[in-house]
Design a protein with these regions (language model features):
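Short beta-strand edge/turn micro-motifs at domain boundaries
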Residues: 2, 109-149
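A solvent-exposed, acidic/Ser-Thr-rich amphipathic alpha-helical stretch
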Residues: 31-83
Length: 149
């Protein structure tokens, strides 16, 4: 669908979207705070462990992972934006650090990796703001000494 009379997506607003998204993930923000970031229709999110669709799919994934990972830190390393008519393809590299505790281990373990991702960003049909329509984790590159997923 092509939106008419809508400003083209800009690299600066997409970079801000990415920074805000990862800040929310770091603090395990309440679920409703993610609604403005995600496309109302056609949302697809491909994680290493699952592919989910729509906000309900995201909700199930998010509720699961915030029960597993803690002390998270996301550091944006790269956000490359390639705009087209009514969307933008974005290559994201984010350094992700998180702790995980697996029963009955005496201590938690630290995961440190770079996640290579592809996002498709569109303008919200309701607000006109940029939203994530497609979110794909393409690959993970672990740092030396990191625990593994």
């Amino acid at each position: 669908m092509t939106l008419t009379n809508v400003a083209p997506l800009t690299a600066s607003e997409i970079k801000q979207l990415a920074a805000d998204w990862y800040l929310k993930l770091d603090v395990h923000a309440p679920l409703e705070e993610y609604i403005p970031f995600l496309a109302e229709e056609g949302l697809e999110m491909r994680f290493p462990e699952a592919t989910v669709y729509g906000f309900d799919g995201f909700k199930g994934w998010y509720e699961r992972v915030i029960g597993i990972f803690f002390d998270e830190v996301h550091t944006l390393k790269q956000v490359n934006v390639q705009p087209s008519a009514d969307e933008a393809s974005v290559q994201v590299i984010v350094k992700w650090e998180a702790s995980v505790w697996n029963r009955p281990a005496a201590k938690s373990q630290r995961i440190i990796l770079d996640a290579y991702q592809t996002w498709i960003i569109k303008r919200s049909l309701n607000t006109g703001k940029p939203v994530i329509a497609t979110y794909i984790v393409d690959s993970l590159s672990y740092y030396e000494g990191s625990a593994q997923l």
